[in-house]
Amino acid sequence: MDEKLPESVDVVVLGTGLPEAILASACARAGLSVLHLDRNEYYGGDWSSFTMSMVHEVTENQVKKLDSSEISKLSELLTENEQLIELGNREIVENIEMTWIPRGKDEEKPMKTQLEEASQMRRFSIDLVPKILLSKGAMVQTLCDSQVSHYAEFKLVNRQLCPTETPEAGITLNPVPCSKGEIFQSNALSILEKRALMKFITFCTQWSTKDTEEGRKLLAEHADRPFSEFLEQMGVGKTLQSFIINTIGILQQRPTAMTGMLASCQFMDSVGHFGPSPFLFPLYGCGELSQCFCRLAAVFGSLYCLGRPVQAIVKKDGKITAVIANGDRVNCRYIVMSPRFVPETVPASSTLKIERIVYATDKSIKEAEKEQLTLLNLASLRPDAAVSRLVEVGFEACTAPKGHFLVHATGTQEGETSVKTIAEKIFEKNEVEPYWKMSFTANSMKFDTAGAENVVVAPPVDANLHYASVVEECRQLFCTTWPELDFLPRAMKKEEEEEEEPETEEIAEN
């Protein structure tokens, strides 16, 4: 039996995707009363992680439109001058195709059968939006300050690969050294290139601390020019240029000199913070982060109700005054919603189509003695595309059974060569035979307005490598809507709280 919803709250949040979860936790942490609803029976929405047996739920996310009799019944809950607004159900994930790929006559038993018999299907955790965390980036800072990090675990992305392609050798994957020790041990760079790379790293360190007048002047002259031109002026050769732009500069696609330097400094600042790699990946998949922020919100009093679709919202004098869910009316001062729910009458200001393919394999794209979490920038192989990358995760990240891997290909739909074509070239070169594939298009929709002044539309899914833009957009939305409140302030340690208690008592006595 459905529980009765509260009659009134400060904020109603629709959808449990990562941005909605961040905003819900920020509201609850700031002392606002929050009701968090999701029509799905699971957390994460379009940012979820699914087991292989549950992934069909992605395709079963449609809600039928209200008919005239339902509208008439809901209208009984309205007061004078109020009107019903039906929520949208936009296709954020579309063109979904899932295929089990036969191995041929030599296969004794289909892989699907093997996994089912061994009860391994539920051990996969398949991300709709795979991302990584920068060790000293905005997301890690937010996780630590808010103590959401108490609910999550992470693994170091311990291998970056840089691809090169020639007609003779095809695509070759070269390991990328990140730390100074790895640079000097690397066989991928010559002695001269190692020295030039160390010189560039030193320059970045000096530039970020404003220690080199000559460097600042050189950068100012090339600030809006391509990063490659700036590197050339610094005497960096073509091979090392490609290495820097495609690995150290992975945080920024098609960089100018300024954005390339900022990305390089971010990269190197994160190296050594948790280990030799600057990147982290959440155990059990990226969908875990949504649940972690929801837990924080619940700790501070947010009410949760999954499987409770909102039928309509109520508008009066240009503002949303209530939501109606399963016949219950909940009055509210603000509403936060996923882009999926923005009414169909409101046009999107922009839409970016993101190509996503997930492969399941039983062999890594580059075998090693120990299993690696791998990041591979494909920008050099798809120069016309804004985003092209592979992320390979497996048992070490708790996203696949032992001996199995998930390869996530992500790319924007630009240029003549698709990210799928490049991924399959890499598989062929390294004799990797995927046994399962899921492909889909993710629509990143942005809205300038949702048709009412007290509605906050959460940031959409995006093609960015890490979470900085999501966190920053959530921060800006929160601070614009509630300028008098702090966005997920740093939690006080128990010692600080205990020290403050006696002081409070003394003030009270005086």
Swiss-Prot record:
Q: What happens when the gene is disrupted?
A: RNAi-mediated knockdown results in mild defecation defects. RNAi-mediated knockdown increases the levels of unprenylated rab-27. RNAi-mediated knockdown disrupts the localization of rab-5 and rab-7.
A GO cellular component annotated for this chain's UniProt record is: nucleus
The main place the protein resides is: cytoplasm
Which InterPro entries does its entry note? FAD/NAD-bd_sf, GDP_dissociation_inhibitor, Rab_escort, RabGDI
SUPFAM superfamilies to which the protein is assigned, alphabetical: FAD/NAD(P)-binding domain
Q: Which GO terms describe its biological process?
A: intracellular protein transport; small GTPase-mediated signal transduction; vesicle-mediated transport
Membrane spanning residue stretches:
none
Q: Kindly indicate whether the keyword rRNA processing belongs to this entry.
A: no
Indicate the secretion signal residues: none
Superkingdom of origin organism: Eukaryota
* Annotated function: Substrate-binding subunit of the Rab geranylgeranyltransferase (GGTase) complex. Binds unprenylated Rab proteins and presents the substrate peptide to the catalytic component B and remains bound to it after the geranylgeranyl transfer reaction. The component A is thought to be regenerated by transferring its prenylated Rab back to the donor membrane. Plays a role in neurotransmitter release from presynaptic terminals at neuromuscular junctions. Positively regulates the function of rab-27 in synaptic transmission most likely through mediating rab-27 prenylation.
**Family under the similarity heading:** Belongs to the Rab GDI family.
Describe, as the record does, how this protein assembles with itself and its partners. Answer: May interact with rab-5, rab-7 and rab-11. Does not interact with rab-3, rab-27 and rab-10.
**What name does this protein carry?**
Rab proteins geranylgeranyltransferase component A 1
| Native species | Caenorhabditis elegans
The upper taxonomy is:
Eukaryota, Metazoa, Ecdysozoa, Nematoda, Chromadorea
Name the gene for this chain. Answer: rep-1
